[in-house]
Amino acid sequence: MLHFTITTLTPLHVALGIMGIVRSQQGEEFAALPAMVLRHVDEGNREPVRLPILPGSSLKGAVRAMAEAISPSCVPVADPRVRALLGKHNRCNDVQALCPACRLFGSSGYAGHVSIGDIMFARGDLRRHKSPLLWKPGRDSAFASRYARQGRLQGRKFYVHRSPAEGDDVRVVIKSGASASGRIVYAGGRREELGLLVAALGADPDHPFPIKIGGGKPVGLGSVLINIDRVVILEHTSVEKFLRHTGRLGGVINSEQLEAGLDVAGESAAQWLREQIQLARRTGVLLDDPYQQLREILARDGLQKTAPSGPY
């Protein structure tokens, strides 16, 4: 189990996809996309409050995309034009011969080994943010000229970090500088693939970098930094008994009744993480060149520049 802290470096926007109304302090009303799923939390004798959350599924999807890019993994896409260009990287279809990313995060007929719980932020972390208007991604006849070269995909697209641009599109966001804690359960997988997971989180103690989550990435939103504070390895028999009883890997996240075989924090945790990443590199699960390229694309010093303003 990995205990981590996530800190927003720019405003974070994860929408429900429906329009909501936001009222300013002056009484003006704006149509805005709700930024976060809001969860009712019972605080004992007080009235339940609604707290903004980052769904674990959103973080898991973002991390999977990076894990696929820095490992010898398939590209599970639906667009037939993309599939025709993938060659050996086409979607896995045999559960006995899955790529590292599919083993980690799951595939059709295979549950995977990673479960990430929802991350709750504080009620006061919500803000209203105005960013440039974004058009839908280009999927027209120019697709091949932008993304393919000599009948093969040029690579994967990742957005660099930028300071947010200003515009007329009102969004509800989690403010920059907000922090929250979360847990990741990794059960039954290979150690080298755990090293791949840590690298994809941007949590390599020697090469940390922020990742991007949610909407508004082109205009500077969604930059977050993840730091793994504590590593807990649970006794196998204890976890096996729990899973037999509940049938839910995610339930391990909130259980306090499992025995720990290893519980380290601080520099001890950092050293343990280094060992997993080194194992991933030695076994070829973590590819050095793509990993270096991803770190350069997502370098934190990109935040010193501002994203372009105006319609995208």
Feature map (PLM): residue ranges:
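RNA-binding basic/glycine-rich loop and surface signature characteristic of RAMP-family CRISPR effectors
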Residues: 1-312
